[in-house]
Swiss-Prot record:
Coiled coil: none annotated. This is Multidrug resistance protein MdtB. The chain crosses the membrane at residues 15-37, 343-365, 369-391, 398-420, 440-462, 474-496, 535-557, 867-889, 909-931, 968-990, 1000-1022. It holds the Pfam family ACR_tran. The keyword Protein biosynthesis does not apply. SUPFAM superfamilies: Multidrug efflux transporter AcrB pore domain, PN1, PN2, PC1 and PC2 subdomains, Multidrug efflux transporter AcrB TolC docking domain, DN and DC subdomains, Multidrug efflux transporter AcrB transmembrane domain. Its main location: membrane. GO terms for cellular component: plasma membrane. Belongs to the resistance-nodulation-cell division (RND) (TC 2.A.6) family. MdtB subfamily. Keywords: Cell inner membrane, Cell membrane, Membrane, Transmembrane, Transmembrane helix, Transport. The lineage of its organism: Bacteria, Pseudomonadati, Pseudomonadota, Gammaproteobacteria, Enterobacterales. It comes from Pectobacterium atrosepticum (strain SCRI 1043 / ATCC BAA-672) (Erwinia carotovora subsp. atroseptica).
């Protein structure tokens, strides 16, 4: 065969056609590299695009929100505000806790941010209260990111304090050591402690005060260095019985001497082993439990981290007593694996559909095999590049590969169809391969680089959305590039070796019937094409109409950000009146959980109340609802949420907010709903005036539902108004007053019990069992300058006021966050417009600033760049095509096909009830790259016919349209069917994939119908314009 090789022809494919062994080995190398890369790639729901985020928590039991703000939050804010790379700082100061969330720029390393945070905490430490029981602690975690795993620890025989001790020492620490874990928090924590409840009448009878008791306990229990004795022959370490470690030790403690007799602590107080904080509670399916919430570090892989935890769980469970049970309530990887598995199935289905299309068009098993090999080679080879680029197997990269299935086969189809045409004309396979590949090589290069050019703007998208789609764009671009290489190397080589005139001429009933069908179809197309070419202005009017309709549809269509996914987990917040007590809140929380547990779609419920780093106020309770797998329920999350809210509405005095857990978390604040809008002012007084007014207006908007605010200024405050003159006359200072109140009502941590494994606190408080109202303040007694004790009521009056339940700041200024969901039947864009309009109509003062947060802010950013992104894609493609064709005119002809795809995509979205979200926008951008393929194939052949055969433009474009009709139809069908599984997907995470499929299918159908007619007409129009412009200079020369 080599002896009959033509001296020229084949273009870039010639070397590979003539060297089949080298070509085969090269393809095997690509395949093996891809397989190795696939096995090493991590799996995740989405690309890792988290902002570097650190949460700083400072606990100050008993402190009011005002005290926490001024004494803790403000000093820390000032230091954190000086850090470089800080994007936003949000703080929440509640009774007993300060929570500061620091979000850094995407480019900043989390480890660098951690060092800056530690340095800022050290710098602020001297400004913090001296009696702060715990120093500020930080975690590399986004508090708004739901836990990747939730465990419930229960026991039928042990108390919750004993269970907590085991969880602390045996489970939580081990899980914290797992790579990727950012924070292990214990909800409903019942840390063991010795609680000293003072009996006010007994104290008064002995003439003692709480300060006397606190001083005695502090002095009696110490743990400090004592030194050693170093003698001539030996050394002795000094030790003493300076620690009290048991409840009995504290009961026997002498706190004073009266009339020569000792007064022991048990004489004036009840001492018991109990929980450090009695105002915390957690339940798993209504059974009291310790809830372990595991949150990942920003950027950590969910599946890798969770797998590591699951591997150690059996050993951890084995170390616990038989009466202690550890149950996994939530495992986020379940839905992630199911979602990825569904996309993998859709990828395989797309491959099968594409191969079926190839066979239907080529009607030959051998001819079908050749382009079919291009699909796995291109897709599998892409995994190698993904590995070296640090990507993961996730929903977006698998979606890119699914869409690429239709793309990667296009080039091979074009090549094999052109080679087969020469073989059918009588050429030998080798000559046909060289001629066909050489003739089509430039077209393949044009198709490839113009399609990749469309993806380039995606790489320059800013912020988190750009990071999110970078893996999508690069994965798709790499697969297209590999497919071009395969199509120019392996495909023509296989055609030269496997195709023959006899194999292509094999006939059966199916091939004869399909041949007659395609012949009639081409004849019908040719007839209509003649009519269209003879009435160009009508066709041009249709083309112009599609452009105008595209603009109108873009304006009309509802716009969203990111599809709401059904991952089988619902987060809930139970809101009660601001004056609710702990026991009352616990009862309400349990009633809500009971109703939810009865729902047939619910598998488990975990809930907790109390103020800690996760929950900001006593009147808020948290819920995590785990639904049954999607295969075991017929309803989606929106229907379930609506039903649960209706069922719990019967409980008086509570409001239940529910939202589905999403794979993408952009927010940094724990919110009751999906979207947030913030107001910021110079003072709390201004916010107190305008927040209620704005809330009233927003609740009227039909586009919104579940409107709520974290502004809570109706908490009951017992204001102690001290007569300073009287206090001074009696020798009593304000420091004594504060200390006495703290001793009585602040769960004050007055001492620490040290053991070999951990430390436990001694908690001091008044026993208010028989006196729970404001009258309990009358039991507080103070020591006067003469050594006697006087009641607080003798120097102070008590009045009940209202005050803040929590104080929020954003970037050091007072703020409030309004949360909302988008009402059914509306899109996020409509909700944002409605809020903006309502805000403008209110004429807020100039010193009150507003802005959207989290997902809503990202939506605004993405929406503002959408038009420019599409324009950039078109410009990039024009530049590439202009360079390839060395023409200003032909790229415009090719780009004229784009409005038809836009009309089809937007109409399909509206018919399917989908918003124009970022996933749909990506689909439209891909359509820009796909639909121009039809025009490129037509124009390439028309230009070749004009140049090589001397045809007139009319005849050249007409012949090109007929010759390329079958491959155009074949490639369009392949691309359409590759998107069809995404459009029809129903599994876990289908909401994420459907908009892309709908856009692709709708756009391809519309563009296929119209561009077969509009492209040749526009080609002839621009050819006439170009001819006319060329004549003008000639006429000027003749005139001269």
């Amino acid at each position: 065969m080599q002896d009959n090789v033509p001296a020229s022809g084949g273009g870039p494919s010639r070397l590979f056609i003539l060297r089949p062994v080298a070509t085969t080995l090269l393809m095997i190398a690509i395949l093996l590299a891809g397989i190795i890369g696939y096995r090493a790639l991590p799996v995740s729901a989405l690309p890792e695009v988290d902002y570097p985020t650190i949460q700083v928590i400072t606990l100050y039991p008993g402190a009011s929100p005002d005290v926490v703000t001024s004494a803790i939050t403000a000093p820390l804010e000032r230091q954190f505000g000086q850090m470089s790379g800080l994007k936003q700082m949000s703080t929440q100061s509640a009774g007993g806790a300060s929570v500061i969330t620091l979000q850094f720029q995407l480019e900043l390393s989390l480890d660098v941010a951690e060092q800056d945070v530690q340095a800022a905490i050290n710098a602020a430490s001297n400004l913090l209260p001296n009696d702060l029981p715990y120093p500020p602690t930080y975690s590399k975690v986004n508090p708004a990111d739901p836990p990747i795993m939730t465990l419930a620890v229960t026991s039928s025989a042990m108390s919750m304090t004993q269970v907590q001790d085991m969880v602390d020492n045996r489970i939580a620490q081990k899980i914290s050591q797992v790579a990727g874990v950012g924070l292990v928090s214990l909800a409903g924590g019942q840390r063991p402690a010795v609680r000293v409840r003072l009996n006010a009448p007994a104290l008064a009878a002995y003439g003692l005060t709480s300060e006397t008791i606190r001083t005695a306990i502090t002095a009696a229990n110490v743990n400090s260095a004592k030194g050693s004795l170093d003698g001539p022959t030996r050394s002795v370490t000094l030790s003493a019985n300076d620690q009290m470690k048991s409840v009995d030790d504290y009961r026997k403690l002498i706190v004073a001497w009266k009339n020569g007799a000792p007064v022991r602590l048990q004489d004036v107080a009840t001492i018991e082993q109990a929980a450090e904080n009695i105002y915390l509670g957690a339940w798993a399916n209504r059974q009291q439990a310790i809830i372990i919430n595991v949150q990942r570090q920003p950027g950590a892989n969910v599946i890798t981290t969770t797998d590591s935890i699951n591997k150690m769980l059996p050993a951890l469970k084995a170390s616990l007593p038989n009466s202690v049970e550890v149950a996994t309530l939530t495992d986020r990887t379940t839905s992630i694996r199911a979602s990825v598995k569904d996309v993998q199935f859709e990828l395989l289905l797309a491959i099968a559909l594409v191969v079926m299309v190839i066979y239907l068009f080529l009607r030959n098993a051998v001819a079908t095999l050749i382009p079919s090999i291009a699909v796995p080679l291109s897709l599998v080879g892409t995994f190698a590049a993904m590995y070296f680029l640090g990507f993961s197997i996730n929903n977006l990269t698998l979606m890119a590969l699914t869409i690429a299935t239709g793309f990667v086969v296009d080039d091979a189809i074009v090549v094999i169809e052109n080679i087969a045409r020469y073989i059918e004309k009588g050429e030998k396979p080798l000559n046909a391969a060289l001629k066909g590949a050489g003739e089509i090589g430039f077209t393949i290069i044009s198709l490839t680089f113009s399609l990749i050019a469309v993806l380039i703007p995606l790489l320059f998208m800013g912020d988190i959305v750009g990071r999110l789609f970078r893996e999508f764009a690069v994965t798709l671009a790499v697969s297209i590039l590999i497919s071009a290489v395969v199509s120019l190397t392996l495909t023509p080589m296989m055609c030269a070796r496997m195709l023959s005139h006899q194999s292509l001429r094999k006939q059966n009933r199916f091939t004869r019937a399909s041949e007659r069908f395609f012949t009639r179809l081409i004849d019908t197309y040719g007839t209509w094409l003649r009519k269209v070419l003879n009435h160009p202005w009508l066709t041009l009017s249709v083309a112009l109409g599609t452009l105008l309709l595209t603009i109108l549809l873009y304006i009309w269509i509802p716009k969203g950000f990111f599809p709401i996914q059904d991952n089988g987990i619902i987060q809930g917040t139970v809101q009660a009146p601001q004056t609710v007590s702990f026991s009352n809140m616990a009862d309400r929380q349990q009633r809500v959980a009971s109703i939810i547990m009865k729902d047939p779609t619910v598998e488990s419920v975990s809930s907790f109340i109390g103020v800690d780093g996760t929950n900001a106020a006593l009147n808020s309770g948290r819920l995590q609802i785990n639904l049954k797998p999607l295969s075991e329920r017929s309803e989606r999350i929106p229907e379930i949420i609506s039903r649960l809210q209706q069922q719990t509405a019967q409980i008086p005095g509570i409001q239940l907010y529910l939202q589905p857990v999403q794979d993408l978390t952009i927010d940094t604040q724990i919110s009751r709903t999906q979207y947030q809008f913030t107001l910021q002012a110079m003072s709390l007084d201004e916010l107190s005036v305008w927040v209620p007014k704005l809330m009233t207006e927003l609740k009227k908007l039909p586009q919104l539902e579940d409107v709520s605010s974290d502004w809570q200024d109706g908490a009951a405050v017992a204001y102690v108004n001290v007569d300073r003159d009287s206090a001074s006359r009696l020798g009593i200072t304000m420091s004594q007053v504060d200390s006495a109140l703290y001793n009585a009502f602040g769960q004050r941590l007055v001492s620490t019990i040290y053991t070999q494994a951990s430390q436990y606190r001694v908690v001091l408080e008044h026993d208010t069992t028989n006196n729970t109202g404001l009258d309990a303040l009358n039991d507080v007694r103070l020591i006067s300058s003469d050594g006697g004790t006087i009641p607080l009521s003798s120097i102070a009056t008590i009045e009940e006021r209202q005050g803040p339940l929590a104080i929020n700041h954003i970037d050091q200024f007072p703020s409030t966050t309004i949360s909302f969901n988008v009402a059914s039947g509306y899109a996020l864009g409509e909700a944002v417009d409605a809020i903006t309009q309502a805000e403008q109509q209110m004429n807020l003062p100039a010193d009150i600033t507003t802005r959207f947060q989290g997902s809503t802010l990202a939506f605004q950013s993405a929406l503002s760049s959408t038009v420019w992104l599409i324009v950039a894609a078109i410009v990039a493609m024009y530049i590439v095509l202009g360079v390839l064709y060395e023409s200003f005119i032909h790229p415009i002809t090719i780009l004229s096909t784009l409005p038809t795809a836009g009309v089809g995509a937007l109409l399909a979205l509206m018919m399917a009830g989908k918003d124009l979200d970022v996933i749909a926008i990506i689909g439209i951008i891909l359509l820009i790259g796909i639909v121009k393929k039809n025009a490129i194939m037509m124009i390439d052949f028309a230009l070749a016919a004009e140049r090589e055969q001397g045809m007139k433009p009319y005849d050249a474009i007409y012949q090109a349209c007929l010759l390329r009709f079958r491959p155009i139809l074949m490639t369009t069908m392949a691309a359409l069917l590759s998107a069809l599984p995404l459009m029809l997907s129903t599994g876990v995470g289908a909401e994420l994939r459907q908009p892309l499929g709908v856009c692709m299918v709708g756009g391809l159908i519309m563009s296929q119908i119209l561009t077969l007619f509009t492209t040749p007409v526009i080609y002839l129009l621009f050819d006439r314009l170009a001819t006319r412009f060329r004549r003008v200079p000639r006429q000027e020369e003749e005139t001269e």
